[in-house]
Amino acid sequence: YEQIPKLVENAFLATEDSRFYEHSGVDFKGTARAVLVSLKGDYGSQGGSTITQQVIKNYFLSMDKTPKRKAQEIYLAYKLEQQYSKHEILEMYLNKINLGNRSYGIATAAQNYYGKELKDLTLPEVAMLAGLPKAPNNYDPTKKENVQKEKLQKPKKLRIPSKKYFTYDVFSQIARNIDG
């Protein structure tokens, strides 16, 4: 955990689980939001799984989308939080997360996409990597068509997911670098 820069930690918490340090493995508020969005027919746009649940899914369970698997995920996430610290869980997550382009884990992604160590990533690079878990292949910055598509959609998509982890100045810097 000590090798993960605070910027990387904050970026992933802001995009993936802004209440990570406040829940016990399952964020029922986030899950309820995801269910409501799904009921409206907007499938895939809202993730209800916490970082802890994603660790359980990535390390221990199949990717099946069944009620039984979801129940197992919730139960095991609660148990994982009893056995490991939040820092250990975050480290597990960042070491296994699929970031596309055959990049499993944040350190591998930093090397594959930017040829850099984690500690050497710039703010815009960290922001790009933190956005990949939602749809790694759709946002892969090495694919020319994704870069072009991203430039066309940028005005609609740029939003602040969590003011808790970044200041307005940080998001302004990200926006300037993305547009440039």
Residue ranges with predicted function:
Residues Y1-I51, Y104-A109, Y114, L121:
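Flexible, acidic/glycine-enriched loop-and-adjacent beta/alpha segments
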Residues Y43, G47-G180:
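Non-catalytic, structured segments within soluble enzyme domains
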